[in-house]
Amino acid sequence: MSPSGARVIIAGGGPAAVEAVLALRELAGDRVSLELIAPNRELVVRAYEVLAPFHEGHEHHYPLAQIAADVDAELVVDALAGVDADAQTITLGSGERRGYDALILSLIHI
């Protein structure tokens, strides 16, 4: 991770959050340091209902640690508890605060 780059936090553990991490690394390279804040250790992808009606489809599990490592991002497994936009900080469920230059919220449940 580039300590001198802009600090970008992506909060969420779903497909959109993962796509944001991958796209930012590809587009910005080492000009950004990336943190993925996710409540779980795995990305779970379920088949769309049109492909597998009544949730009979299979789930696919992908380890977020490996995805993050592949693009030199930091994975923090914790819940997002709060955002202070004025101070540009987030608070995690553990109480830890982290600063950011840019924040992407990709939350499934509110």
Language-model segment annotations:
Residues 108-110:
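Conserved small/polar residues in nucleotide/adenosyl-binding loops
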Residues 2-74:
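Beta1-alpha1 glycine-rich phosphate/pyrophosphate-binding loop at the start
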Residues 9, 103-104:
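Conserved hydrophobic beta-strands of the Rossmann-like cofactor-binding core
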Residues 93-102:
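Core beta-strand elements of the Rossmann-like FAD/NAD(P) dinucleotide-binding domain
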Residues 3, 78, 98:
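Structured loop/turn residues at beta-strand edges in well-structured enzyme cores
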Residues 89-91:
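Residue-level detector of beta-strand face positions
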